[in-house]
């Protein structure tokens, strides 16, 4: 019986772009007329949002920071924390997947931390860190476990017969790791990275809301919320969503191109 593995869908695949643009246009029209009907400063329409976007992009905020400064401030912190999560999560996931005894003996120590949300660490992060290390630490906590878990689960699905074949032919443990385990687990790692990127992006916005920086989309939204400037707040929200969407699509595109074979119909 033929079975097709579930595959991730990109918003940029052929045919999808048109439908996405039509949906976006319809949503903007509904939003525009709803704002006209309500006529409230607390429910601005897309025209006012566009005006606020242009002001922020061209002139910056009251501190002289442009919209791009805020966007890059958040993105830079995410990339640093995410990078550390990849560098630690992948090797540890491989180790725990290959050494079942080690995983069993340390599971009760490691696993409880998976259920502590990153924002719960904010008070400790404020006490022990400042600047970039504070945000990188929080982002790392949000991104680490999706990568670690996906890698660990991927290793557990490697067929033992594949390892035995290489062992029979005299392959070393390192060769088995690099030629059998890692290539097999890479698709799972990429899947975990996409989940981790979403968690990291959510974490940075929450972390920036607590202060400790004058640059960042979360910080920008708080500053304008205190001034009751709703259009500027919504600009920040939309940018958070747009950047997160682009990052996810970039990882998804890389995953589909590198591991096209995984989504083929198999017997």
Feature-to-residue mapping (PLM):
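Hydrophobic alpha-helical transmembrane segments of polytopic membrane proteins
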Residues: 217-253
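Membrane-spanning helices that line or support transport/gating and their immediate boundary helices
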Residues: 94, 101-108, 150, 154-157, ...
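Generic hydrophobic transmembrane alpha-helix motif, especially the helices
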Residues: 111-146, 153-154
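Transmembrane alpha-helices
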Residues: 137, 141, 174-206, 235, ...
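Transmembrane-helix boundary motif in ABC transporter permease subunits
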Residues: 80-110
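Short cytoplasmic-facing helical segments at TM-TM junctions of multi-pass membrane proteins
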Residues: 150-189, 221
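Transmembrane alpha-helical segments of polytopic membrane transport and secretion proteins
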Residues: 1-25, 249-267
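Periplasmic/extracellular loop-to-transmembrane helix junction in inner-membrane transport proteins
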Residues: 37-83
């Amino acid at each position: 019986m033929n079975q097709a593995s579930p595959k991730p869908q990109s918003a940029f695949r052929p045919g999808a772009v048109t439908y996405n643009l039509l949906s976006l246009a319809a949503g903007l029209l509904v939003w525009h007329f709803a704002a006209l009907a309500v006529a409230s400063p607390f429910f601005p329409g897309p025209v006012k949002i566009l005006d606020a976007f242009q002001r922020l992009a061209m002139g910056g905020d009251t501190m002289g920071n442009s919209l791009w400064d805020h966007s890059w401030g958040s993105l830079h912190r995410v990339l640093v924390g995410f990078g550390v999560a990849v560098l630690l999560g992948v090797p540890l996931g491989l180790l725990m997947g290959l050494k079942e005894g080690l995983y069993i003996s340390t599971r009760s120590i490691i696993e409880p931390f998976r259920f502590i949300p990153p924002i719960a660490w904010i008070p400790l992060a404020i006490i022990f860190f400042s600047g970039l290390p504070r945000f990188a630490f929080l982002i790392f906590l949000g991104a680490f476990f999706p990568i670690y878990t996906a890698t660990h689960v991927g290793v557990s699905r490697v067929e033992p017969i594949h390892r035995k074949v290489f062992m029979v032919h005299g392959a070393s443990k390192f060769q088995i790791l690099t030629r059998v385990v890692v290539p097999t687990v890479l698709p799972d790692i990429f899947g975990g990275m996409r989940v981790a990127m979403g968690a990291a992006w959510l974490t940075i916005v929450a972390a920036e809301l607590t202060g400790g920086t004058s640059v960042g989309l979360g910080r920008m939204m708080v500053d304008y919320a205190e001034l009751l400037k709703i259009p500027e707040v919504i600009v920040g929200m939309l940018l958070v969503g747009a950047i997160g969407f682009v990052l996810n699509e970039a990882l998804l595109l890389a995953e589909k191109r590198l591991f096209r074979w995984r989504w083929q119909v198999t017997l």
